[in-house]
């Protein structure tokens, strides 16, 4: 663990950094700045490549490559320059604009500096950047991870399909089931929410300060700006929000977060059931020779991976409602209270990713205690009650259920 990790206030960037380091590429301050730079540059290039914008100075392909490199080669050193500019501007998006202007000047393209950020409000850049960050995380990381995780659940379900065992309803012995079937339940539930997350494509708007293309029409009222901006947003593989105020209404983001919240509940259920089967000695945990289960009771192998997953999933689900409820509400055409909340979107996903890794680790340690499971099943003849009273009903024996439970 690095010094920076040891000094982190949040365990996400401290204790659990190795479990969600990949999310730095999607939700860190660096990722946000880099994506803003990308959006600004791609908007400028989009304008330069659109023939109807005759007010722009002529440029060639070599110059376009120089412009493109501003975001393609963007790194931590360049991000530090943006942060230094922000100390002067006290405005994060304006700092990005100033940075790009300086970069254009440095490659001999001063003639383009006045067209950086043209027809944009900061929220055009911001909403598109956040949508892009979330969408890339959803498609590049979350969905592949879920698919891989659920594949392992299904393997366990198939492997343990023929291990018959007691089931428990209301904490009491109930009709028999199989260990594999109980894991198959979770496979199907996770698949359901995985499909919902797969449908949760993100959206963005690019229609100016109050959503009416005011500046755009001042620039050129003959251009079909909704069509132009739709084409630009679609180039990021995002859905286009034509109708908005200054802010994009975030309903697609809320849809995704709601689906993640529901998935989290299923994973909490899985964590608790695994914990309970371990406590019943139906599932054993493979012991590592170097790990310590308890500081005072060396015989113990605690189900810490499932407890860790449960705790972090609970944290994710405590944050998600706060983020959802705030981002769907904004005073009139815009207030800034959503800004600090948006910066915490990544936390909702980080706690989920920590949990998935803990669950993966915990599940790999599990093996069924076939002897214990078989002994308890064979010692529980009362669970045949359902089958017996059903056969009694078939043979038209009156009050079969009551007759079975009586002392007679």
Model regions: which residues?
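A structural signal for well-ordered alpha-helices, especially hydrophobic packing surfaces
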Residues: 47, 97, 104, 142, ...
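Glycine-rich cofactor/substrate-binding loops
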Residues: 1-34, 62, 85-90, 281-282, ...
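Conserved helix-loop functional segments at active or binding sites
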Residues: 159-163, 196, 203, 234, ...
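A helix-coil-helix interface module used to build multimeric assemblies
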Residues: 2-216, 220-229, 293-294, 304-308, ...
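Glycine-rich anion/phosphate-binding loop at the beta-strand->alpha-helix junction
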Residues: 246-326
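Alpha-helix capping and helix-loop boundary segments enriched in small/acidic/polar residues
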Residues: 122-125, 170-181, 216-223, 243-254, ...
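A glycine-rich phosphate-binding loop feature that marks nucleotide/adenosyl-phosphate handling sites
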Residues: 209-211, 287-291, 372-377
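Active-site-adjacent "gating/activation" loops or surface patches in catalytic cores
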Residues: 226-246, 250
């Amino acid at each position: 663990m690095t010094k920076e990790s040891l000094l982190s206030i949040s365990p996400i960037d401290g204790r659990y950094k190795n479990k969600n380091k990949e999310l730095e590429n999607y939700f860190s301050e660096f990722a946000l700045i880099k994506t803003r730079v990308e959006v600004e540059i791609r908007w400028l290039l989009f304008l330069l490549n659109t023939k109807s914008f005759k007010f722009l100075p002529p440029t060639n392909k070599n110059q376009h490559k120089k412009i493109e490199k501003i975001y393609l080669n963007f790194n931590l050193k360049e991000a530090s320059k943006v942060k230094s500019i922000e100390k002067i501007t006290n405005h994060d998006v304006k700092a990005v604009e100033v940075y790009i202007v300086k970069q254009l000047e440095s490659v001999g393209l001063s003639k383009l500096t006045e067209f950086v950020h043209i027809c944009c409000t900061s929220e055009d850049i911001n909403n598109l950047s956040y949508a892009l960050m979330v969408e890339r995380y959803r498609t590049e990381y979350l969905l592949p991870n879920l698919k891989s995780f659920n594949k392992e659940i299904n393997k366990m379900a198939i492997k343990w399909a023929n291990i018959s065992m007691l089931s428990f309803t209301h904490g009491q012995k109930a009709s028999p089931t199989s260990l594999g079937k109980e894991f198959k339940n979770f496979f199907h539930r996770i698949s359901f929410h995985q499909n919902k997350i797969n449908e949760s494509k993100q959206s963005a708007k690019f229609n100016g300060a109050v959503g009416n293309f005011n500046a755009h029409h001042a620039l050129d009222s003959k251009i079909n700006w909704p069509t132009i901006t739709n084409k630009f947003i679609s180039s990021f593989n995002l859905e286009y929000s034509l109708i908005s105020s200054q802010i994009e209404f975030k309903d697609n983001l809320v849809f995704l977060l709601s689906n993640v919240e529901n998935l989290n509940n299923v994973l909490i259920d899985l964590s608790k059931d695994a914990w309970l089967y371990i406590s019943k000695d139906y599932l054993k945990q493979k012991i590592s020779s170097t790990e310590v289960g308890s500081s005072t009771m060396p015989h113990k192998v605690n189900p810490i991976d499932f407890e860790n997953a449960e705790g972090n999933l609970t944290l994710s689900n405590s944050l998600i409602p706060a983020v959802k409820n705030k981002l769907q509400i904004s005073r009139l055409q815009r207030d800034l209270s959503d800004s600090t909340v948006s910066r915490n979107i990544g936390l909702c996903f980080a706690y989920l990713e920590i949990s998935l890794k803990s669950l993966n680790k915990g599940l790999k340690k599990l093996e069924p205690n076939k002897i214990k499971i078989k002994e308890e099943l064979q010692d529980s003849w009362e669970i045949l009650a359902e089958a017996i009273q059903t056969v009694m009903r078939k043979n038209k024996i009156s009050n079969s259920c009551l007759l079975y439970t009586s002392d007679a």
